[in-house]
Amino acid sequence: MRIVTWNVNSLKARIERVEAWITAVAPDVLCLQETKMTDEAFPHDRFIALGYQSAHHGEGRWNGVAVISRVGLDDVRPGFADGRDDPDPDARILWATCAGVRVASCYVPNGREVDHDHYRYKLDWLGRLHDDLAANTDPATDPVVVVGDFNVAPDDRDVWKPAAFEGMTHVTKPEREALQRLESLGFTDVFREQFDEAGLHSWWDYRGGAFYKRMGMRIDLVYASPVAASALDFVVVDRNERKGEKPSDHAPVVADFSLI
């Protein structure tokens, strides 16, 4: 079962690239972030033409997440079910069950600056993700895969130059501790199960030739419950999709599991 996460940074701007990539790579489940469109504008028909069902949770010019599947799309749910009465104000998470695997497509808030309200929102959001998983899944027995743009580099290996990011978001102790809380539920960052070295990134700024200078961060993550993680065959960042004309600033992360 091939599960992919990809922040496309505007699906409207990159739909042709996404279609070509799907045709070439044949994911079973493709989770998109930053679609930047309303639900009414989402091109379900174009994915149907490729043999995929799709679900979308969007709001317009910002945010937006989707799950696109050729192996079934059931129990679709946007937002959190964590027992709180306040819904997430942004379109940032979409859940679906695909061939028996519970999948979440996540676009974690950026945080902006450490002293900004958006940073506090980010930490709260990650806490809500933890609480939703704790309340609605059993990671010890259920195949669950949580993917997306987490806007957090799990450790210093995931940042091209850690000293350049001191005091900035994406690398702070509270953000990283929020990811560790997910791991405390039993979830595994499957990329780090296969690759230990530094310098393997999934995002590069458009400016200053950052991609070709390898000045990036690994913030697009795949977390798997024990059942799913034990079935991992391989995981890879598709750097080639960051090349060419009008790419996203993120590359797809492809994870293959022996689950179907």
Feature-to-residue mapping (PLM):
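Short, Asp-centered acidic motifs that coordinate Mg2+ and/or phosphate
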Residues: 28-29, 143-145, 221
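Surface-exposed cleft-lining segments at the edges of enzyme active sites
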Residues: 81-84, 108-127, 163-167
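Acidic/histidine-rich, metal-coordinating catalytic segments
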Residues: 142-156
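Catalytic metal-binding/acid-base residues of hydrolase active sites
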Residues: 9, 36, 107-109, 151-153, ...
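Metal-dependent phosphoester-hydrolase catalytic domains
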Residues: 39, 48, 76-81, 155-260
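Structured beta-strand-rich core segments of catalytic domains in phosphoester-bond hydrolases
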Residues: 35-38, 42-113
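N-terminal, active-site-proximal structural segment of metallo-dependent hydrolase catalytic domains
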Residues: 1-56, 62-65, 154
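Active-site-proximal beta-strand elements of phosphoester/diester hydrolases
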Residues: 1-10, 100-115, 147, 250
